[in-house]
Amino acid sequence: MRQKFTSWTNATRVGIIFLLSFTIATAQQVVRITEPTAIDPAEVSIAINPKNPDNMIAASLQIGRPPGPRAGSYNYVTFDGGKTWTTVPTPNASKLVQGDDVVVFSSDGVAYHVHLSFEGIRQARPARAENGMIVNVSKDGGKTWTDGTPAINHVNTVTPFEDKPGIVVDNAPASRWKGNTYIAWTRFDVYGSANPEHRSQIYFTRSTDQGQTFSMPFRISDTGGDCVDSDNTVEGAVPAVGPNGEVYIVWAGPLGLVFDKSLDGGLSFGKDKVIGNLPGGWDFSIQGLERANGMPNTAVDLSNGPNKGTLYVNWIDARNGDLDVFLMSTRDGGETWSLPVRVNDDKLKNGKEQFFTWMSVDPLDGSVNIVFYDRRDSSGALTGLTFARSVDGGKTFVNRKIDVPPFAPNSNVFFGDYSGISAHGGRVVPVFMHFVEGKLVVSVALFKFKPGTQEIFP
């Protein structure tokens, strides 16, 4: 948490189309996707529609945007390759707090947006107590969304508390379970509690009918964590699907990086396997931010290239004395793993921090694309962004600076817990929060590569 249909026509009444873009020598275009009336948007995600790559959907929360006094979830939709965007609110008939937004597409162009939905957290005697995770579905590229289906929901209680979902659709052409939707997340017995009897665990559910219903959630973590929401909490579970429908999940916690998998379409999982340590933990103190993290995310190469089936894990830790971005991979379903590859290419042990990393593996060309916040070129709290791309199976990366002016975060403004990126057919689109004249906004950077190469189209 670390904090009826909605129509396209109604969306234009809530937010106008807003465009801010410029092109630099690397043929990169930065476009602001939140309109001027957006209030503190954060926790971003983005997905490219494989049926129509000019159609993309990004998502974020906004803090207290009228008419609602609470944080709510929003979609940002484009049909022209990212040149212009329209804001579409996520349905919220119950008027609950929303957040931790993640959006994905299925191979047939159906969009899924999962988010938290809760009220009464951190209140001793809440007037209203409810919490869960809702999945909204769009079959028209994000113009309209279903009211939402609970993947899990608790009425009249916030214990346990469900937090930080990751979602994936099985888009593997040869999978027996193609089209299944999988969600993994952290369950807190009591969110924020330091009581050692209160535990956190990783839970899982699936849908086999395009998000209309979800199975009974079950625990997949063999070893849990505490409920403090820090290094010893199990968190950061992001599912990925292999070419034969394997479901892979990696999370962070007191044991380090932990891996689990399902070979039966998400009906059951095996024993946890610790695949790496996390020097310095996953919860960081970053100047200018209320909090920051290096929690892992996962993705699989579903292309027909030489690295098909490779599972990648991307995270941040302090093994070199400062915070660096890393990638590790397995080509045999998690039995053996590569050594960690340092993704950021600034000088080793230079004391500069990277944080909030996210990854997308292009399903057509197999490239590994990673975005992260970066302080290599600045001092103090000034922050930039870097996009790193690998076309050799994650062995080496080319780092490119995203062309936004360095900014200083405001610790009094919630900055979220992650960035986002999506890649498809050589098109790569990172999405991120940044400050412009003291105001928090969300932008995308539009890159177009010759597939499978580092060559950028002009």
Specify the residue positions occupied by each region the protein language model found.
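Extracellular, repeat-based ectodomains that mediate carbohydrate processing or recognition
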Residues: 27-458
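N-terminal secretory signal peptides that target proteins for export/translocation
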Residues: 1-11
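Bacterial N-terminal signal peptides
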Residues: 11-23
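Intrinsically disordered, low-complexity regions enriched for glutamine and histidine
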Residues: 1, 26-27
